[in-house]
Amino acid sequence: MILKENKKMFVLPEFGRIQFEGFQRFIHQDLVEELTNFPKIEDIDQEVEFRLFGERYRLTEPCIKERDAVYQSFTYSSDLYVPAQLMRRRNGRIQRQTVHFGSIPLMNSQGTFVINGIARVVINQILRSPGIYYDSELDHNGNSIYTGTIISDWGGRFKSEIDGKKRIWVRLSKNRKVSIIILLLAMGLNMNDILKNVRYPNIFLRLFQRQAENIQSYEDAIVELYKNLYSAGGNLVFSDSICKELQTKFFQQKFELGQFGRRNLNKKLNLDVPGNEHLLLPQDLLAAVDYLIGVNYGIGTLDDIDDLKNRRVRSVADLLREQLGLALDRLEILIRQTIHTVARRKRLVTPKGLITSAPLTTIFQDFFGSHSLSQFLDQTNPLAELTHKRRLSSLGPGGLTRRTASFQVRDINPSHYGRICPIETSEGMNAGLIASLAIHAKVNDRGSLLSPFYKISKTLGEEHIVYLSSEEDEYYRIATGNTLSLDREIREERATPARYRQEFLTIAWKQIHFRSIFPFQYFSIGTSLIPFLEHNDANRALMGSNMQRQAVPLSQPEKCIVGTGLESQIALDSGSVVVSNQDGQIAYLDGETISILLQNEKTVDIKSIIYERSNNNTCIHQRPVVSQGERLRKGQLLADGTATVGGELALGRNILVAYMPWEGYNFEDAVLISERLIYEDIYTSFHIERYEINIYTTSQGPEKITKEIPHLDSYVLRHLDNNGLVVPGSWVETGDVLVGKLTPQEAENSLRVPEGKLLQAISGIQLANTRESCLKVPIGGRGRVIDVRWIYDEDTLPNIANMVHVYILQKRKIQVGDKVAGRHGNKGIVSKILPRQDMPYLQDGTPVDMILSPLGVPSRMNVGQIFECLLGLAGDILKKHYRITPFDERYEREASRKLVFSELHEASQEAAIPWLFEPDHPGKSRLIDGRTGDIFEQPVTIGKAYMMKLIHQVDDKIHARSSGPYALVTQQPLRGRSRGGGQRVGEMEVWALEGFGVSYILQEMLTIKSDHIPARSKLLGSIVTGKSIPKPNTVPESFRLLVRELRSLAVNSDHNLIFEKDLRKKVKDV
């Protein structure tokens, strides 16, 4: 973006840099510090000393390439080697060796980690920064209670409070509190020290007289603290055992402020404690309580705990450093145990004999495999991938939980301005807890979020960029982004909207310190792709941001006519496109390889990705866009990737839409489409499914991959080669065998079946002692086999495979039940596919591609879609592409509407289509019914909208069951498609069936089809023999379960048969 005033080019940041910067900090800084802090280890007699030289560590080059790690299902990692020294003081002998510490997974060029062939990403956690925070709460009487909470970096928290009687307590748990005076005296301070170092000595003196008058010494304070903590009565006397118990259970509890906590505490309480003192000291507690008294009297400020200055981001560096620290702690314990054992047995040992690679390797494996912040990378499309790397989570260890997080924590805070996107977040339970970084935000070494601003120099008249944290920018007056459009002279005359101390106000330009740099500065990359964003309700913009990440890459992608200008940057930073790193010339080109002849006569080969499966089963494929012999410049596009065209992100297609009702088929967000979208492959996508089968060694011997499978029809084995694997290129249907496998079993088991006994009795034939356990194509898995891979375990012997992967490609056209959406939160399900001749058509005979409901616009307040489709129509006719920045009303009122109408008018004039822009109803046109040829009564809004097909496809959701598993307890069918579940008729379904009076269907659903075991078993026989289905004469299993549950509560239930005449007699007697 070029700014006229200062003639400077402003460059967008690299969107994936938060991941790269974090990992580089871990490798170059945190790893060295943790290894350097590893302590010297000595035996009991101090004769043997072990130490590490962490600053001279070495990471080896990975033994496998990034792409091969994915292909062979390996982990992309590097081995860590550290020099170690073992010294024996008795004879002065020193042994130095470089020891193997284990393997550390490496970040690849995409900013992700490849673990067992699967791309994973470590997302950033945002949580409360350690330090002290002052707040006020209401007690049960409605009175304000002032509290000060010290949050640790590692450990618990201290909460001090002043109650209604002006007494000061330290709360240790929800129900336990202790007087601050008793605690300070027990921590070793005396009354003189306390009174000298506080601003309010009189208050402390009164407290001492009211709460601790009987305490004359340190010993009395220890006894009193013990009574308060453990509710001990009687006349306790000070003893070493009481003191020792308090030391171990209370004072030595891990409470570490850390580097950031110490800095925050010193700053807030004006202390001069050294920065390397990370533990909580008595003077910290004293100063904290002294400040709390001041807050109670109106001196000092309360903290907004949700302000970003009180929160910090734990990046991948902090999370990996924490895991490394745990591994080194575990290793230290193992080394100590080994040294003590060796010293006791008088054995010799080397540094390599002391260190094992297990702790580091296993801890990193557990972290990447099961930690809540190490996630399966969302690879639906390039935008989803990039957004996942820029995600901020308040959940995870040390963070919030989705059930206890309040509305206040989830809400937007003024400090988020330019740092965290106010639009993009999850829907549902995680709303407000999962956020996304704003476009220009970055994280510094202290974990603070920074946003860039132009600093306005009053003297020089120049501007330069400054990054400010939330703590810094509240002291400055910052003009908002709408001032970008104004000339300097006009700006200085007008009052300017600005932000100061988290409030919005209007002030003169000469009072401004900083100004925003970019209209998109406040939003995430997903939200920044929505054109005319300012005309949409925030809830719909949120849905639009989220649904773009669910768009399936199409086989024939198309760039949007109306965009925002960020599409090329997102495509580049996601890593889906290939660009040239140097000047040169294309020497050779085919579908898989691009060879570039450099200026120094060397040749560089670049391998393209061909039909690779993503984590979300979408297809990753790169297409060359250069020709042989073409000259290249550095940075030039070589190949388009998934969902990109010409180096720009292309998630959907520009199609002709009309906003009108059509026979009720687009009721409630349903969508009507033309069959042209199917026949011309407009919304056709490729999906690659991976099926795997393990090869085990059983107690009876190893399993065998073979084509010779007894008891199976040769038809289902027709695609297998001689080795028992399916041939790549085969078209397979449901039930076909992909991998033939035989599992050995005990001979006795096969002879127990009646056929086995009969064969053995007649002719002495021994039945085969194997059973088939083949990999077969599941229901809905039909497609083309594109690859078959043997997978070898990294830790086992070479050439012994333990798994086979089969990849099947499916070509899916759009169909009824698929979900489609625009970029403005306008989503819908395809309800009917009409022939082209039945679709409404324009006055020039062009049939409409999609009919949307007009009632979906006014109530949702996402008018941006109307602007987009009208401007798209003008762009389609004029052969133009538009890139619109948001908030264009800063130029003039109704700027968006004027732009759209002026472009429509120009298109109407140029193409000589008068009905394209009619002044009586601009943006609307008369449509003709394709079935009757009649003109519809009202003019209809038509346009070219950019619509996407989403990953929620009917093929993945539709499910039917004829037979399947039952739950053990209730004996009812399991729930869910993945478990092969069936129908479960609940109360409301029963009411619906009762309303129609279908008693037999209802009776079958509640008994035979569900949980009536005897009736279920008799049903098959009656169907086979053609007899009538027997009526159940016992109760279903769910009733038995109810009876058992009542019995477990000591309530017995019984039933007796009462004849009608007996019942009449009893009623008569009553």
Swiss-Prot record:
Pfam families: RNA_pol_Rpb2_1, RNA_pol_Rpb2_2, RNA_pol_Rpb2_3, RNA_pol_Rpb2_6, RNA_pol_Rpb2_7
Cellular compartment(s): Plastid, Chloroplast
Any single GO CC term annotated in Swiss-Prot or TrEMBL for this entry: chloroplast
Family of the protein in this entry: Belongs to the RNA polymerase beta chain family.
Keyword Plastid: yes
Entry EC no(s): 2.7.7.6
Enzyme class: transferase
Physiological role: DNA-dependent RNA polymerase catalyzes the transcription of DNA into RNA using the four ribonucleoside triphosphates as substrates.
Entry keyword set: Chloroplast, DNA-directed RNA polymerase, Nucleotidyltransferase, Plastid, Transcription, Transferase
SUPFAM superfamilies reported in the protein's UniProt record: beta and beta-prime subunits of DNA dependent RNA-polymerase
Listed name of the protein: DNA-directed RNA polymerase subunit beta
Broad class of the protein's primary localization: plastid
InterPro entries: DNA-dir_RNA_pol_bsu_ext_1_sf, DNA-dir_RNA_pol_su2, DNA-dir_RNAP_su2_dom, DNA-dir_RNAP_su2_hyb_sf, RNA_pol_bsu_bac, RNA_pol_bsu_CS, RNA_pol_bsu_protrusion, RNA_pol_Rpb2_2
Recorded catalytic activity of this chain's protein: RNA(n) + a ribonucleoside 5'-triphosphate = RNA(n+1) + diphosphate
